[in-house]
Amino acid sequence: MTIYKIKYIPDIEEDYYLFLNDAIEAGKNYIDKIAMEEKDGWDSATITYAKNCLNDTLEFKGVVKIKAVNVHTHKGELK
């Protein structure tokens, strides 16, 4: 079974999603959050570029990264 790990790089946090689309959507929301928290903010072109990179490569330059992780179950437990 494959799940998707998303790593929020500036915050060093991780979340896991069963579906890739959910992980990408979470990454886009995080990009919006980071863009607003930046001192001068990001312009709309930068935000669009970041989200397109996330869609195409599953990561954006040290901000967010999505990775497929294979997990195996054993007696109802994830390993």
Predicted regions and their residues:
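Short amphipathic alpha-helices within nucleic acid-binding modules
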Residues: 23-26
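Short, mixed-charge low-complexity intrinsically disordered segments
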Residues: 32-79
